[in-house]
């Protein structure tokens, strides 16, 4: 039996720095625009597994991790099935099977928008960051297509 092991996973549990209301994840750039590291196998395992669960606290200090738009897309939302936070669980609407199964499970199910609203209520919506035109990193998908780029953050002076 040949092929990538990630394509044979039933479940994968991943962490993230940010997730947006489209279930896109960012594991490379902090909410302050600082390059944190590489994406590793995050997008590969998310795409390959039958069910991708991403865990994150709702807030990192006073910074919301659930937001309208991630700083950088490293894992596309169509490959993410469930977001688990300390304030509730959001299931991607494309996974009706999971939504139906969760109805009678007595779990704190919320929409991703509800989680974002809770985060913005507990800590203000972050101001948009400003970037230069200079690209400092390229985010590629499994097939080598460019998903996003990381630009140099403008000085805070």
PLM ranges: what are they?
Residues 1-157:
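Conserved phosphate- and dinucleotide-binding cores of soluble alpha/beta proteins
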């Amino acid at each position: 039996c040949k092929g990538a092991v990630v394509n044979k996973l039933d479940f994968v549990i991943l962490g993230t720095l940010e997730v947006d209301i489209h279930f896109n994840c960012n594991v490379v750039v902090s909410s302050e625009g600082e390059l944190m590291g590489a994406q590793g196998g995050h997008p590969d395992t998310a795409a390959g597994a039958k069910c991708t669960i991403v865990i994150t606290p709702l807030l990192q200090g006073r910074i919301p991790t659930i937001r309208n738009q991630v700083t950088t897309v490293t894992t596309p939302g169509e490959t993410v099935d469930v977001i688990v936070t300390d304030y509730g669980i959001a299931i991607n609407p494309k996974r009706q099977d999971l939504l139906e199964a969760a109805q009678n499970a007595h779990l704190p199910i919320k929409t991703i928008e509800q989680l974002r609203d809770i985060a913005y209520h507990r800590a203000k919506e972050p101001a948009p960051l400003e970037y230069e035109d200079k690209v400092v990193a390229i985010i590629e998908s499994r097939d080598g297509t460019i998903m996003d780029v990381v630009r140099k953050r403008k000085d805070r002076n």
